[in-house]
Amino acid sequence: TIILDEFDQLLEDSQIHFVEKITHYAPRDHQLIYMSATTKFDQDKIAANTRTIDLSDQKLDNIQHFYMQVDQRHRVDMLRKLAHVDDFRGLVFFNSLSDLGSAEEKLQYRDILAVSLASDVNVKFRKVILEKFKDNQLTLLLATDLLARGIDIDSLECVVNFDVPRDSEAYTHRAGRTG
């Protein structure tokens, strides 16, 4: 059995040739499981004898969404105030690396335990940062959409979108880190 999670991302990144290469070398009677939380694709073009399990009607009643409009120049200060709430721990998503880096610098200057995690951080250090966050050693984990997919952090109560997500799929994956 071969399981490919975040298959929609492979399709978007035009990586289907890697999937074809993997399946070429797999045993003839292999089972291939494609998983995707947000994108529907024509699976019959990819494989024969397919089955779809649609979970899109499942509601996550334990996730509350609310919107707060904050002027761009006051957003870091808003994060600072959130960080001072007792037992607060949050994952903050940014659309750009420059905004993420700037916010990290400003928060650390104000003695907030905030660390950024983005594509420019090596995998070994990413794991260290995630473990520190999971162990409550960090108050804020600042991230790009790299972290919106495929991570699991128990008891994460708050996701903050520093920037409006670029599309509804990004929003779904960001919000899905809670609940």
Question: What is each stretch, according to the model?
Answer:
Residues 1-179:
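Conserved helicase RecA-like core
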